[in-house]
Amino acid sequence: MSERHSIRIGPAGWSYKDWEGIVYPPHRGRFDELAYLASFFDTIEINSPFYRIPPPTHSKSWVRRVAHNDAFKFTTKIFKGFTHEKAELKPGDVDAFRAYLDPLAEAGRLGALLLQFPWSFKDSPESRETLATLFGQFAGYPQALEVRHATFQNEGFVDFLNEHGVSWVNVDQPLFHESVKPAATVTGPVGYARLHGRNYEKWFAHSESWERYSYLYSKEELEPWVERIDEMAQAKETYVITNNHFRGQAIVNAVDLKRALGQEAKLPGTLGDNQANVSSQSDSPTPRRKNPK
């Protein structure tokens, strides 16, 4: 077996009100959530740029706040104007987003730029033209593409990503008709996986956005992902992001994966050293449906 490259595992985001007193210890006054989590994980996916392009002062601050962890690298979502809501895109947004990325890249703290597209985005010549344009706009940064429609899961599209030097994002999500299925595909500069949970009941029928991400994976459900991650890491530096963030469930599962892959890991805050504490925080048990291995 070839040598395993580095595997960084961590949550999507760090600023959630429902993490207070669970992921983060009870505190008064100022508390640096990012710095705290960077003592437990070597990566975190930055969510906030999806909603608004941050100024470079934000990325410079984030770099400073993880300085105590030499191994730490961020991944970051791209602004939704490039992928979801084109009407929100303004002249100068490419330059503004690159200016935000530069402090991360120059500090050696940028693992990947996540280009996340919705399920409604399907493979077609027009879609590939859209993607090629976007790849060119952010040339020079390590890019990873998340698509969720099954039409993209073909050898021709893998070749397309390899030609452009862009990573495929392997996804775990509820499997509906024409959903992308779990895989261990590696293209581009890094291996990348995102685990969103399997909350079938609330994935589309939710009143609050957090509801679809309220899901705690069992260790049995994570076992196939341990194998996939190990396979991905034979080829590339790999990032694994747990996005089932509600009430810290992403933290528990990130620690589960780290331990299963032989990495030292401990649970932060008041989570305790088992899944019972966080699962008891959920409003109700999530109905289980098996995803294919």
What kind of feature is each model-predicted range?
Residues 1-293:
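Residues lining hydrophobic/aromatic ligand-binding pockets adjacent to catalytic sites
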